Swiss-Prot record:
<dbReference type="GO" id="GO:0009428">
    <property type="term" value="C:bacterial-type flagellum basal body, distal rod, P ring"/>
</dbReference>
<feature type="signal peptide">
    <location>
        <begin position="1"/>
        <end position="24"/>
    </location>
</feature>
<keyword id="KW-0975">Bacterial flagellum</keyword>
<dbReference type="GO" id="GO:0030288">
    <property type="term" value="C:outer membrane-bounded periplasmic space"/>
</dbReference>
<comment type="similarity">
    <text>Belongs to the FlgI family.</text>
</comment>
<dbReference type="Pfam" id="PF02119">
    <property type="entry name" value="FlgI"/>
</dbReference>
<dbReference type="InterPro" id="IPR001782">
    <property type="entry name" value="Flag_FlgI"/>
</dbReference>
<dbReference type="GO" id="GO:0005198">
    <property type="term" value="F:structural molecule activity"/>
</dbReference>
<protein>
    <recommendedName>
        <fullName>Flagellar P-ring protein 2</fullName>
    </recommendedName>
</protein>
<comment type="subunit">
    <text>The basal body constitutes a major portion of the flagellar organelle and consists of four rings (L,P,S, and M) mounted on a central rod.</text>
</comment>
<comment type="function">
    <text>Assembles around the rod to form the L-ring and probably protects the motor/basal body from shearing forces during rotation.</text>
</comment>
<dbReference type="GO" id="GO:0071973">
    <property type="term" value="P:bacterial-type flagellum-dependent cell motility"/>
</dbReference>
<keyword id="KW-0732">Signal</keyword>
<keyword id="KW-0574">Periplasm</keyword>
Length: 369
């Protein structure tokens, strides 16, 4: 009997350890290392080779840009000549410079039309310098565009467009020319910034790092960052960070949350969202105000004057409302399903969710985006 009880105790410990480990996540997914981040690049360029779908005559800076490009190749246009070409489009080129990239490596670029170009399909981006916020050129972009959209137009002017045709990408279209310096090895310690600030998660991170690197290796002043002592040698520091970001940490469990997109009407409900006992009555009130005018015609012998008198009509219509009554602990998903079954609009759903939140019956967080 004692042996059986010991086996049950061991199984319970194993199950608890398994459930805890399943909630754990690598530290690298919970934090970002200060000094290791991406940088944004942007540039202005021209896309050529378009089959009549480029910028029109109203976009004057496109013609000026063409003249500047020709001037670099020794071609000078007479004064007062305005270039007109529907095969060229002025574009903005943007790219993401990953941390640690060195000269010679390639990155993807996004090309977006600035003018009234109808489509960039089939175009080629001319050599375009890409600058960071400090104005320094860090990469050069050039290549053929990949445009996912399709546009077609008939002689009568009717057109059909599928997806976006005024923007495209060039995979591996930019070459790094200058490295962005990093301050990763400038300090004796490394700061880890939590992607989701939490005192509990910061405490768990400090405890996990101390178990790996020894007591006092990590400190935290608040719930947003953790300071970790790191080797001064660059090679040893990289190896230390690789080992550090691989350790498993159990983060704080996120509170139940319901997210409502007011533009699209999308409602996303996280697991565990419940409500307290509540009763909701919601009706649809429609108010219609119309403005018009009537002609006031006096009697023929009355001596009056014909006049136009404004007329306002206000119509109020209220549909039949229903009373919803939910017991304690019911899931919010069931509530939304019940509301939707009555034919309620997304605005009605949002109004009910906001009312539940204001009444304190929503056991979670309501986020409106």
């Amino acid at each position: 009997m004692c042996a059986f009880a010991a086996i049950l105790s061991l199984l319970s410990v194993l199950l608890m350890a398994t459930s805890r480990s399943s909630d754990a996540a690598p530290l690298g997914t919970l934090v970002s290392v200060e000094g290791v981040r991406d940088n944004q690049l942007v540039g202005y360029g021209l896309v050529v080779g378009l089959n009549g779908s480029g910028d029109g005559q109203q976009i004057r800076y496109t013609g000026q840009s063409i003249a500047n490009v020709l001037k670099q190749f020794g071609v000078t246009l007479p004064e007062g000549i305005r270039l007109r070409s529907r095969n060229v489009a002025a574009v903005m080129v943007s790219a993401n410079f990953p941390a640690g990239y060195v000269p010679g490596q390639k990155i993807d670029v996004t090309v977006s039309s600035m003018g009234d170009a109808k489509s960039l399909r089939g175009g080629t981006l001319l050599l375009t310098p890409l600058r960071a916020a400090d104005g320094v050129v860090y990469a050069l972009a050039q290549g053929n565009l990949v445009v996912p959209g399709v546009s077609a137009q008939g002689r009568s002017g009717s057109s059909v467009t599928i997806n976006a045709t005024a923007a495209g990408r060039i995979p591996q279209g930019a070459t790094i020319e200058q490295e962005i310096p990093s301050d990763l090895d400038a300090k004796p310690s490394v700061r880890l910034s939590l992607k989701r600030p939490s005192f509990q998660t910061a405490t768990s991170i400090v405890a996990a790092i101390d178990r790996m690197a020894g007591p006092g290796a990590a400190t935290s002043r608040d719930g947003t960052s953790v300071e970790v002592r790191a080797p001064e040698d660059p090679t040893a520091r990289v190896a230390f960070l690789a080992k550090l970001t691989a350790i498993n940490v159990t983060p704080q469990k996120e509170p139940p949350r319901v997210v409502f997109n007011s533009r699209t009407g999308t409602v996303v409900i996280s697991q565990g969202m419940t409500v307290s006992p509540a009763a909701v009555s919601h009706g649809t009130l429609k108010v219609t105000i119309s403005e018009g005018a009537i002609v006031s015609q006096p009697n023929p012998l009355g001596g009056g004057k014909t006049a136009v008198v404004p007329l306002s009509q206000v119509d109020v219509q209220q549909d039949g409302n229903r009373m919803f009554n939910w017991p304690a602990g019911v899931s919010l998903q069931k509530i939304v399903d019940t509301i939707n079954s009555t034919g309620a609009s997304p605005d009605d759903v949002m109004a009910i969710l906001q009312a539940l939140d204001e009444a304190g019956a929503l056991n979670g967080e309501l986020v409106v985006i």
